[in-house]
Amino acid sequence: YLMGVGTPNDILGAVKRGVDMFDCVLPTRSGRTGLAFTWQGRVNIKNNKYQNDNTPLDLECENLNLNKYSKNYLNHLFNTNEILGSMILTLNNINFYQELMSEIRSNIEKGTFNDFHDKYINKL
């Protein structure tokens, strides 16, 4: 059990060292402040570079309900202080962490965790 450690990189490193349970507020706290976790890495949705970006937040997200929101729409929600932006990013982050943990379990079962770790340790 590892408490208070919550970045995807920290989780990957801890799993590699044998930790199998985590508890951290990072996914929800980050969502409320405009930071999204995605399979392509972290996205600070408040950044002006997303004002005209009509692509989904995470192209690899399996949850189609979350993937329908564009970066420019989420950027608008955060920059106008709409609570919906925080809610969507919080749900996105929780979903991402569920997908991450599912992929970790699957790769452990298949014996491919080290490859998975190496692919994502510097990306997430």
List the model feature ranges, each with a label:
Residues 58-124:
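C-terminal extensions of enzymes
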Residues 1-57:
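Glycine-rich phosphate/ribose-binding loops and adjacent secondary-structure elements
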